[in-house]
């Protein structure tokens, strides 16, 4: 299994390949998006937004974020959400996507795990990026113990991090046969984070 990292949202379509487990993209306006996210993190300390987006409600999506965040420049985040949602529809044939934007002050998922869904977008807009382990470097015996103090790594392997502002599409456990899903967890610190997740929903 391998990971692909690029700067175009079209790269996400590589996830259809059996040998690809994750695709990460740092978009052209990522610095502007991070700056926007810093404002959100500063102004909204206990944020937990959720929106079900059925692809034909772009204005409703923008209005929801604008009202919820009390900010005018939400297109910086809603425009890329619309783009990647269309890619999810193409990859999974889903009818809509579920969007969550959450502020965190402690690890939401402290134990390495996989998501039992076809795939998931994870974007750390502010703070440390999600930690993950390439499939071929996972020690599955340790993984099955589910101990937060034991990293399920093979010898000489290292935990990897998605970059802040990077849009990452991870295969889940129900994507294809003979693949358990991308092993990942929240970073182990109490640093404030702003996390965006987007899931296909049938």
Task: Give the positions of each predicted feature.
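Catalytic micro-motifs at enzyme active sites that drive phosphoryl/nucleotidyl and oxygen chemistry
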Residues: 11-12, 108-112, 183
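Catalytic core of non-heme Fe(II) oxygenases with the double-stranded beta-helix
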Residues: 106-166
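Extracellular-facing segments of soluble proteins and assemblies that are Gly/Ser/Thr-biased and enriched
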Residues: 67-106, 110-114
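Catalytic core of Fe(II)/2-oxoglutarate
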Residues: 152-202
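Short helix/loop capping segments that flank catalytic or ligand/cofactor-binding pockets
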Residues: 33-34, 132-134, 171, 178-179
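A structural signal for short, well-ordered beta-strand segments and their strand-loop junctions
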Residues: 23-26, 96-102, 123, 169-170, ...
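Short, surface-exposed beta-edge/turn micro-motifs
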Residues: 19-22, 118-121, 165, 192-193
């Amino acid at each position: 299994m391998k990971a692909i990292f690029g700067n175009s949202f079209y790269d996400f379509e590589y996830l259809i390949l059996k040998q690809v487990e994750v695709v990460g993209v740092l978009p052209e306006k990522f610095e502007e998006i991070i700056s926007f996210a810093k404002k959100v993190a500063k102004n909204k300390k206990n944020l937990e937004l959720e929106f079900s987006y059925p692809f034909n409600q772009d204005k409703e999506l923008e209005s929801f974020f604008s009202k919820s965040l009390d900010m005018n420049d939400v297109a910086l985040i809603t425009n890329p959400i619309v783009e990647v949602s269309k890619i999810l529809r193409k990859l999974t044939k889903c009818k809509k996507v579920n969007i969550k934007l959450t502020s965190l002050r402690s690890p939401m998922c402290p134990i390495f795990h996989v998501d039992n869904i076809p795939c998931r977008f994870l974007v750390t807009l502010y703070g440390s990026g999600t930690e993950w382990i390439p499939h071929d470097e996972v020690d599955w015996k340790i993984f099955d113990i589910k101990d937060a103090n034991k990293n399920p790594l093979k010898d000489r392997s290292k935990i990897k991090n998605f970059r802040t502002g990077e849009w990452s599409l991870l295969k889940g456990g129900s994507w294809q046969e003979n693949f358990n899903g991308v092993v990942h967890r929240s970073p182990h610190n109490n640093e404030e984070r702003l996390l965006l997740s987007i899931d296909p929903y049938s």
